[in-house]
């Protein structure tokens, strides 16, 4: 959610500060953040302090947890959209799949999860292999995922 409207470089340069501020990204910890914690985060100059994005991170963590409970894991939720198949696409920054997942996550209550951000996430976790067929890494992404909890 923090990347929305910013460069990936900006967010990645703050990765360790985010890890510290968000308790190592432990889901239950982030889900429990309250108003006092959000206020403290707004004072932390080492992270992105946009109030709406901070609130979204907590809300999104809670929705993420709900999806885990509903589907067994967030991985199962994502791979359910492709019946466990890796999609090979090269070039776009969004797709009908990222449109659908973005819409579903928004319907569930997440924010700052637009189709471009979801598309990038799907690439990062291996649901979409966006390597050009001539790229030396094109074959490195497995055709079938290894299920993870």
Please tell me what each predicted stretch does.
Residues 1-149:
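HhH-family (HhH-GPD) DNA N-glycosylase catalytic core used in base-excision repair
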